[in-house]
């Protein structure tokens, strides 16, 4: 398993391996919920392909409050439409911002 900062940018749903990064998830939780703007109770919501008990890569996380995290898992397409979100684009934006932060550190 590789650390998130070492990953080259890729389209969100084509990540070849599962990446785990607690610092990245902690950073994601520092943002407001993308759906409602809440600042508290933010979770790093995994997006992208997953099945059974396996989560998608941490690099595919977005910040959502508990309520909207649960709603997203009930139907991603409907969720994106309802809140006018482009989840793959949000993931790419967050990944790019994280890489820039890591370069500056």
What are these model-derived regions, one by one?
Residues 1-25, 30-32, 37-43, 59, ...:
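A boundary/linker detector
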Residues 39, 50-53, 77:
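Compositionally biased, intrinsically disordered low-complexity regions
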Residues 42-50, 65-71:
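Histidine-centered catalytic micro-motifs
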Residues 48-61, 82:
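Short linker/helix segments within small regulatory modules
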Residues 62-82:
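Short Cys/His-centered divalent metal-binding micro-motifs
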């Amino acid at each position: 398993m590789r650390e998130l900062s070492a990953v080259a940018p890729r389209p969100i749903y084509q990540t070849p391996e599962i990446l785990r990064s607690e610092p990245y998830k902690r950073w994601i939780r520092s943002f407001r919920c993308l759906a409602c703007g809440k600042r508290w109770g933010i979770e790093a919501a995994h997006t992208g392909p997953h099945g059974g008990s396996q989560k998608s890569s941490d690099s595919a996380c977005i910040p959502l409050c508990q309520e909207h995290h649960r709603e997203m898992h009930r139907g991603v397409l409907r969720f994106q439409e309802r809140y006018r979100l482009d989840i793959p684009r949000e993931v790419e934006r967050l990944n790019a911002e994280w890489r820039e932060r890591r370069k500056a550190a």
